[in-house]
């Protein structure tokens, strides 16, 4: 995505997921260079995904899109392992990826954190985003600002102050507005997938509840009249001074106006979990405990955490898989 973003061309970013997953699978399967090349050819030719997944009212498919790409990437690696070839040159060809999907781009040689050559690109895992809140990433700073302002407003004006707000203004930047603050459906979400990709919903939920969790998107919350009333007061506006700051920062300026004319403002530039404001190891562990223990139990989660912290010493990735298995439960 850093070399050639796909969103503006109408393609979904998971298109790259099939290729990156293929490379991970190729390494795990110990494919030769020739086999890996064919695996990439197969993954790229067959897995171009439409951006419609993330526009307007969103469906359950949003949560499946990348996992589907990863599954197809693994399949491409297995096919290449067994001798199947794919069309080439897949990127520079007459009807290839660059001509029809991404546009031209160049990649630096992959290096790593100890690479001696400064021209080599570091491993991108060091630049990964981790979500602190269960909302679309561009909404992370908005939720953080909303929670801080909620405490400030209630302390100053009383417990019912949030319901007495007259206007909620979310100042943001072009990419964020396009993804989660433009479509009319963002003000009237009827699915979890639309709600967690909605500036109005995420901010309103944070202001009303004082927290944003997975339960913030339960069906009964999507129908909550108080939430819908608060969303009507939300305006999303571009902030010219934010132009060009993403992805180094993801700024949100949240302004609340009360019926008495008092104005409260909070700006958050870099969310917790961003490479510029990383979560601690303890934060990441606690997130896994909170989310996974409901499905696999806390004891299994603790074993998983211990295993992952020593993963580089393991000889076979297959030993990880049983720790990810959800126990069967009788109906």
Q: Where would I find each of the regions flagged by the language model?
A:
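Glycine-rich, mobile lid/loop segments that gate access to catalytic sites or pores
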Residues: 1-75, 82, 87-94
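Terminal-appendage/accessory-domain detector
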Residues: 54, 58-71, 78-331
């Amino acid at each position: 995505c850093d070399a050639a973003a796909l969103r503006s061309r109408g393609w979904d970013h998971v298109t790259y997921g099939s290729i990156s997953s293929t490379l991970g699978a190729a390494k795990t399967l110990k494919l030769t260079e020739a086999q890996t090349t064919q695996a990439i050819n197969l993954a790229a030719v067959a897995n171009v995904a439409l951006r419609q997944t993330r526009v307007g009212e969103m469906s359950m498919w949003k949560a499946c899109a990348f996992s589907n790409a990863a599954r197809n990437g693994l399949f491409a690696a297995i096919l290449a392992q067994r001798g199947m070839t794919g069309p080439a040159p897949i990127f520079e060809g007459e009807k290839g990826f660059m001509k029809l999907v991404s546009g031209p781009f160049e990649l630096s040689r992959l290096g790593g954190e100890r690479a001696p050559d400064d021209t080599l690109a570091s491993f991108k895992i060091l630049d990964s985003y981790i979500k602190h809140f269960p909302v679309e990433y561009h909404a992370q700073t908005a939720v953080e600002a909303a929670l801080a302002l909620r405490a400030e407003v209630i302390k100053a004006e009383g417990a019912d102050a949030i319901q007495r707000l007259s206007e909620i203004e979310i100042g943001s930047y072009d990419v964020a507005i396009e993804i989660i603050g433009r479509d009319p459906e963002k003000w009237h979400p009827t699915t979890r997938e639309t709600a967690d990709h909605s500036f109005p919903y995420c901010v309103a939920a944070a202001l009303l509840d004082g927290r944003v969790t997975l339960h913030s998107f339960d069906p009964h919350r999507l129908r909550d009249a108080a939430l819908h009333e608060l969303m009507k007061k939300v305006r999303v506006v571009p902030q010219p001074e934010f132009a060009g700051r993403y992805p180094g920062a993801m700024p949100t300026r949240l302004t609340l106006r009360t019926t008495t004319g008092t104005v409260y403002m909070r700006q958050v530039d870099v969310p917790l979990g961003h490479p510029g404001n990383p979560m601690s190891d303890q934060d990441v562990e606690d997130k896994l405990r909170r989310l996974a223990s409901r499905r696999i139990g806390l004891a299994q989660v603790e074993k998983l955490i211990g295993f992952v912290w020593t993963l580089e010493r393991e000889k076979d990735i297959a030993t990880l898989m049983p720790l990810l298995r959800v126990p069967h439960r009788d109906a």
